[in-house]
């Protein structure tokens, strides 16, 4: 369950922490902290988008937030590509790293925006329960193709926030962003 207010008080009470004491690395984190939670501006944006989506009566109204969300996702992927790099792609030694000149603050900014996207997806899924509306372009933005980098990052974020599912090895350390998702010698299309 996501927090309903913008305050950072007792945020860990609603979140599963999978880090098991494993330290974060410069390029990724195994636990979320106050640097990753929504800023008041992002919380307001989340509330407005969820409200518009929840109150929509048809697909045209559902698409009202599509342009803004599409730009946000595009900016998020641009940020990911400018902050991080993948080395030894298509090998068993694939690793992710911060690009030269990038800082932990840049990493945290990406994770915060990713947390916004995860939160929006969860809230929209909650608002869709019991509705017969067809999935629209907004929902499709929030559910990227399984071979994409964004899918891997959202999957890892979900595991940190909600707890791991069966598609994760229980002994794996979950890291956000998941820079090596679908980048090794074995890939899915």
From Swiss-Prot:
Gene3D superfamilies (alphabetical): 1.20.1260.90
Pfam families named in the record: NleF_casp_inhib
Chief place of localization: secreted
Cellular component aspect of the GO annotation: extracellular region; host cell cytoplasm
Keywords linked to the UniProt accession: Host cytoplasm, Protease inhibitor, Secreted
Transmembrane segments: none
Localization in the cell: Secreted; Host cytoplasm
Location of the region described as Interaction with host caspases in the Swiss-Prot/TrEMBL record: 186-189
Domain of life: Bacteria
Gene Ontology MF annotations: peptidase inhibitor activity
Assembly description: Monomer. Interacts (via C-terminus) with human CASP4, CASP8 and CASP9.
Function: Effector protein that alters host cell physiology and promotes bacterial survival in host tissues. Inhibits the catalytic activity of human CASP4, CASP8 and CASP9, and thereby inhibits apoptosis of infected host cells.
Full protein name: Effector protein NleF
Organism: Escherichia coli O157:H7
This protein's encoding gene: nleF
């Amino acid at each position: 369950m996501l927090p309903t207010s913008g305050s950072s008080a007792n945020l860990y009470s609603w979140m599963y922490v999978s880090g098991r004491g494993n330290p974060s690395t410069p390029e990724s984190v195994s636990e979320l902290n106050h640097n990753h939670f929504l800023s008041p501006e992002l919380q307001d944006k989340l509330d407005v988008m969820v409200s518009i989506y929840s109150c929509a009566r048809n697909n045209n109204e559902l698409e009202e937030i599509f342009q803004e969300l599409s730009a946000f996702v595009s900016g998020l992927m641009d940020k990911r590509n400018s902050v991080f790099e993948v080395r030894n792609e298509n090998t068993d030694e694939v690793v992710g790293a911060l690009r030269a000149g990038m800082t932990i603050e840049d990493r945290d900014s990406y994770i915060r925006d990713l947390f916004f996207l995860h939160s929006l997806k969860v809230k929209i899924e909650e608002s869709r329960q019991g509705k017969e509306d067809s999935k629209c372009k907004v929902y499709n933005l929030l559910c990227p193709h399984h071979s994409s980098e964004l899918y891997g990052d959202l999957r890892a974020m979900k595991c940190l926030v909600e707890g791991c599912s069966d598609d994760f090895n229980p002994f794996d350390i979950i890291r956000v962003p998941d820079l090596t998702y679908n980048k090794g010698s074995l890939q899915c299309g």
